[in-house]
């Protein structure tokens, strides 16, 4: 997986044995399928090159990525991610449809 694979999306980065990551993924699955077509979930251990490309150290981290794979916004921490995720996905959906 490369930065172009996650272009124009929100990308949730998680890692194993991370309780906030688990809670955040459960939240994501609860809103499926309404907005998750605009979201990719990436497991840190499975995609080290992508994690390195975005210089990630804390999890969960939600990135909003433009059509070129460039980071537009970074939100760190499960509670912060859950509070802002639906609004971010709605914004991406709106921008794709205009």
What are these model-predicted stretches?
Residues 1-33:
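Local sequence-structure signature of Cys/Sec-based thiol-disulfide redox active-site neighborhoods
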Residues 54-64:
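Structural micro-motif
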Residues 26, 53-54:
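Chalcogenol-based redox active-site neighborhoods
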Residues 43-46, 60, 79:
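Short beta->alpha connector loops
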Residues 13-14, 36-49:
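Thiol-based oxidoreductase modules, predominantly thioredoxin-like and allied folds used
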């Amino acid at each position: 997986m490369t930065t172009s694979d996650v272009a124009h999306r929100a990308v949730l980065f998680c890692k194993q044995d991370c309780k906030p990551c688990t809670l955040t993924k459960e939240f994501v699955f609860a809103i499926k399928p309404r907005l998750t077509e605009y979201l990719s979930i990436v497991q840190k251990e499975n995609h080290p090159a992508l994690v390195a490309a975005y210089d990630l150290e804390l999890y969960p981290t939600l990135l909003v990525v433009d059509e070129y794979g460039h980071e537009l916004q970074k939100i760190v921490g499960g509670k912060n991610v859950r509070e802002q995720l639906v609004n971010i996905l709605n914004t991406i959906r709106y921008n794709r449809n205009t």
